[in-house]
Amino acid sequence: MRYPLLAACLGLCVSAQAESLDARIAEGAALIPAFQKHLLETVQGAMRQGGPAQAVAACQTLAPGIAEAHGQDGWRVGRTALKVRNPANAPDTWERQVLEDFARRAQAGEPLAGMQRAEVVDGEVRVMKPIATGAPCLACHGTQVEPQLARLIRERYPDDQATGFREGELRGAFTLRRPVDDGEG
């Protein structure tokens, strides 16, 4: 090699960039547990106060603010799914591909809990982690939603696709994004 010093410098730059990206990905992934907990506690509290109908109202009115509150340091936090209830949460092309990959892997027997995907897409660091359908979710998202609740869901979400799930199935994913270079180093 004619330019060993240049090669070494380039290698260090690439290594530093990879470490910086890994740090950003870890930073984003670290936001998910608190967001998940806050969302779950809000929905469970609404269920205790007024049953599934109150939980549907809480999801519709409070969930967007909870997502916004958990976005920090340039991160935007949200949820998406292949079968959405709220059309505002529909996946973009990359999210759809990741969700389909999560679904294939789960179908092949890989546990959802161990999955995560992170990439740089169009100048943004993107992170997704799957959401498994939990037992409490089945009242509104399961295979046997009570008729009165189903009517309420149709009133609030005329294009609802988010039913028919079984416990443990892929319900959707947490999705996070932030600019790769936002001027913070």
Stretches with model-predicted labels:
Residues 19-133, 148-185:
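Extracytoplasmic c-type cytochrome modules immediately beyond a signal peptide or single-pass transmembrane anchor
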Residues 134-144:
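The canonical Cys-X-X-Cys-His
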